[in-house]
A protein has these predicted regions:
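A short, conserved acidic/glycine-rich loop-to-beta-strand motif
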Residues: 134-139
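Conserved N-terminal catalytic core of the sugar/cofactor nucleotidyltransferase
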Residues: 1-7, 15-18, 22, 27-111, ...
């Protein structure tokens, strides 16, 4: 099992207006501490998934800003949506890309704009179902 993370970071920021805007959507805001919500999402998942297996799907106009925010994630792993078509299309783009990179990939999809206080509990909640994937279906 090859576990990858896909972080959805293509939001336009209109629902959190006036704090977030089209050029500075919610995922780039620092709501607590010193990290943006996007940076905190990457840090939160890194104990389970190394940066080279983290992919971020973002809007084309946010590509450079996303790369700049995440120096630990390879720039090639920042996928740009040609046109924003919401969640299903972004997940589909990442799945299509990962299928080409690693046919054995298992993808965890995460939003970039959630504030989660207990990172250890979050990672533990992701690990619980993963062990079942290594169990045989029939014995």
């Amino acid at each position: 099992m090859n576990l990858y993370a896909t972080i959805l970071a293509g939001g336009s920021g209109t629902r959190f207006w006036p704090v977030s805007r089209v050029q500075v959507p919610k995922q780039f805001l620092v709501l607590q501490g010193t990290q943006s919500l996007l940076q905190a999402t990457v840090q939160r998942i890194t104990p389970l998934i190394p940066p080279e297996r983290i992919y971020v799907v973002t809007a084309a106009h946010l590509q450079e800003q996303t790369v700049a925010q995440l120096p630990e994630v390879p720039a090639a792993n920042i996928l740009s949506e040609p046109v924003g078509r919401n969640t299903a299309a972004a997940v589909g783009l990442a799945a299509w890309h990962l299928m080409r990179v690693d046919p054995e990939a298992l993808m965890v999809v995460l939003p970039a704009d959630h504030a989660i206080a207990d990172s250890a509990a979050f990672c533990a909640s992701l690990q619980r179902p993963l062990w079942r994937l290594n169990m045989p279906i029939c014995s």
